[in-house]
Amino acid sequence: IGAAGIDGAGASTLKDDVFAAVAYCPINNLGNADAGYEWEYGAVRSDANTPALGGVAYSAGAQKAASAEIAATFPAYLDGLGLGVTSSTLAAAVTAQLKEEIERQIAKGTAVPQLGGSFTTARATLPNDWLTLTGTGTSAKVANIDYGKFVAYVAANQQLKSVVAFDAVGVTGNPNISGETNLFGSAASRYANFTAWSWNHNTVAGDASGQDDTGQDWAAYTASSSNTLARQIKLINPIAYLNTSADAAPYWYVRHGMVDRDTAFAMQETLYQAIKKDPSVKDVSFKLPYLVGHSGNYDVQEAFAWIKAKLDANP
């Protein structure tokens, strides 16, 4: 901020209050994002929609077993948050968001295909085998959404991330250092694994990450005061601060495209539920925009109208 933000004694003269947050496909809660991704997509993964790693197909290598192991950790995590949505109701909560968005589009005159018709996105034209409508024209309503088939449709529209989706380095044959893994580490390391599964399965010798190099499993390493990894993970996770004594921004505008597979719907719904429950939050606008992929600023008029309305209400 510089000199303009401090007084003569060096103390800050600026507030750090955040009035509102506007977020498009927020990649959030990285410590649990892999678990949410595999919980969401593991059942529909195949060689057709999941990249091979090191020339080894999804079904033939380590990815398939890893997906199942990682997915199995998500229900206990979600259920332990106490948000009111659980692993047994999460799919229904996302389905309700889909229904709301689709009916909103129909009322605006958007041509939404009947069952057996086709959806066309910027990437593909694929059959509608998951959405059943009743009625016609702008008065049509959603009669049924087959959530499992919807998830498979999203994976067919754009190939999924490989396993592991976020904490990818040094595991399941992935040679690449992900952008997420680069976010963590220390002065002595280029990166650090940031989930228990990837830490405990890292097989790259000499990268200073994982049990193989540190001699400590995930639980022991993150409990140690000799490193800051656990703190780093917490600092970039809004779930760790919502519904606590922290003072959250009062207004939130969150969008995640209806065909965006860059993170799981499970993670965005979890974020939405946490925001909605926080007593500091006055309003949250959350949508899954119709047939939108991984992008932002596609609704500038709507977003700025929302911002203006909040500013006008708080002169």
Spans of features found by a protein language model:
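Catalytic His-Asp charge-relay segment
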Residues: 20, 249-257
